[in-house]
Curated annotation (Swiss-Prot):
Keywords: Lyase. It comes from the Bacteria. It is an enzyme of class 4 (lyase). The keyword Lyase applies. PANTHER family: D-GLUTAMATE CYCLASE, MITOCHONDRIAL. This is Putative hydro-lyase Mrad2831_3350. Gene3D superfamilies: PSTPO5379-like, PSTPO5379-like domain. The lineage of its organism: Bacteria, Pseudomonadati, Pseudomonadota, Alphaproteobacteria, Hyphomicrobiales. GO terms for molecular function: lyase activity.
Length: 271
């Protein structure tokens, strides 16, 4: 079944993860993936030359909250069977970013023209995967309701370095009432494969965020007077780290534009 638009600006509907990936591969969908195929886990991408892969793997092990590994490809491989059938790492994400020397060099709809045989792909857990659990728990998510990407911010919290990889932790933010924030901690603490429990609640200044209305990535999301900002470690962290490290080459997903896998969110607590 192919994609069709949702009502009132809602996310499009796909039959399953394979259907979504095929629509993305064919260029029929290029938007952010929050709320798409909600039963399935989504992943952030970090694609590096083989020479840098070992240091990055160690970086992920030392920083499991922002960089929980769901899968790692063989050098040059565009398939990753552990995460999905009929999955192509070079075409099945709605948007890619290419960084050279720490600077954004290109934004591409696919990587077919730049793929190399020495590239290794890391797929990292994404907070979009726990959003279905939050919604099932009765916790409203404003960015989903508004059809926006989640708001993401650089913080003053430094990651643990490994080789050339170092830099600030990036967080995603969801506004919630206090009672919902408590439930959100309980729900997401059971899902360490997709960032786990929040790293901070409340005053954003305590983690170096000056203005919630001006996210570094994603879209601003309004906060009501009776709500708290709740912050989770975010898989955009590797992009900030790559920029800080001025790596010769790395390729990532565009923020909010994830790889939709065949993994089910309900199975993530057991990975």
């Amino acid at each position: 079944m192919s994609q069709h638009p949702g009502a009132d600006g809602a996310a499009p509907v796909f039959a399953d993860a394979v259907d979504a990936r095929r629509a993305i591969r064919a260029g029929r969908f290029r938007g952010h993936t929050s709320g798409l195929v909600p039963a399935h886990a989504q992943g952030n991408l970090m694609i590096l030359p083989r020479a840098m892969a070992e240091d990055f793997h160690r970086f992920c092990q030392q920083n499991p909250k922002p960089c929980p590994i769901l899968g790692v490809s063989r050098p040059g491989a565009r398939a990753l069977p552990t995460l999905g059938a009929d999955l192509d790492l070079a075409t099945d994400v709605p948007g890619y970013r290419v960084y050279e020397g720490g600077e954004l060099a290109a934004q591409l709809p696919d990587l077919t023209g730049v793929w190399r045989e020495d590239l290794v792909t890391f797929v990292l857990g994404c907070s979009f995967s726990f959003e279905a659990g939050l919604i099932e728990a009765g916790i409203p998510l404003r960015h989903v309701a508004l059809g926006r990407n989640v708001a993401m911010y650089r913080t003053s919290i430094e990651t643990q370095p490994s080789g050339p990889f170092h830099g600030p932790l990036v967080v995603s933010m969801r506004p919630m009432k206090a009672a919902d924030a408590i439930k959100a901690v309980q729900v997401t603490a059971r899902m360490p494969a997709v960032h786990g429990a929040p790293i901070h609640l409340g005053d954003p200044g305590l983690i170096g965020i000056r203005d919630l209305a001006r996210p570094d990535f994603g879209d601003p999301v309004p906060i009501e007077p009776d709500e708290l900002p709740v912050f989770w470690a975010c898989g955009v962290t590797p992009q900030a780290v790559a920029m800080a490290a001025r790596l010769p080459l790395c390729i990532t997903h565009a923020p909010g534009h994830m790889l939709i896998t065949d993994l089910l969110n309900r199975d993530l607590p057991f990975l």
